[in-house]
């Protein structure tokens, strides 16, 4: 599992400021599209929150995680807003606008 986590962390480190990725997208880019839950476990165990920006990972519909390991959904939202990401009226990230393509 440790090797899986390292692959996940490598992907998350690439998510640029001002964009977000989904759990499923990180799983796919880490090598296994069925790892969405593993991505969640890895992010919860993140050994370096400042170096691995796990707050940039959201659900497929743009929602923050209610179980965000480093302070809850409100902290995750504040971190994303500090990155320049805006939220819709219903509290979601506009994935068409802020979703990372995984390229570059």
Question: How should these model regions be labeled?
Answer:
Residues 1-104:
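Nucleic acid-binding interface residues in structured DNA/RNA-binding domains
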């Amino acid at each position: 599992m440790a090797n899986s986590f390292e692959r996940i962390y490598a992907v998350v480190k690439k998510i640029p400021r001002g964009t977000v990725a989904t759990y499923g997208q990180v799983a796919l880019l880490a090598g296994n599209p069925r790892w969405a839950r593993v991505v969640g476990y890895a992010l919860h165990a993140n050994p370096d929150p400042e170096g691995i920006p796990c707050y940039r990972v959201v659900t497929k519909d743009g929602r923050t995680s209610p179980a965000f390991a480093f302070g809850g959904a409100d902290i995750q939202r504040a971190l994303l807003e500090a990155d320049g990401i805006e939220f819709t009226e219903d509290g979601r990230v506009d994935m068409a606008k802020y979703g990372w393509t995984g390229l570059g």
